Design a protein with these regions (language model features):
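N-terminal cap/leader regions of alpha/beta-hydrolase-fold enzymes
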Residues: 1-95
Length: 95
């Protein structure tokens, strides 16, 4: 079963994509997004891990700047620049 969930953090709630295996008890992995957010590629990777018996969770790392980023992997300069801008903001939010 695949779903989006909300996780409460100390400074607010953020979304995550979760893919669950058929078994109730399973090892878990955290799948970190690339520049493009929790997009179709990341969700597919989580789904494949669930098919292999893992619970896979992909948190939305950009939630403080722009929740729900889902950019297509492309060579389009404007999308690539947006992704780089979000990644820079993410790094700044860690300090």
């Amino acid at each position: 079963m695949n779903d989006r969930i909300a996780i409460e953090g100390h400074d607010g709630a953020f979304a995550a994509y979760i893919a669950r295996p058929k078994t109730v008890l399973a090892p878990a992995v955290v799948v970190l997004q690339e520049l493009f957010g929790v997009n179709a590629d990341i969700r597919k990777h989580c789904d494949e891990l669930a098919e292999q018996g893992y619970l896979a969770l992909a948190p939305d790392l950009y939630w403080r700047q722009e929740p729900g980023v889902d950019l297509n992997v492309t060579s389009d300069g404007s999308i690539l620049n947006s992704a780089r801008h979000l990644a820079t903001g993410f790094r700044a939010s860690l300090v």
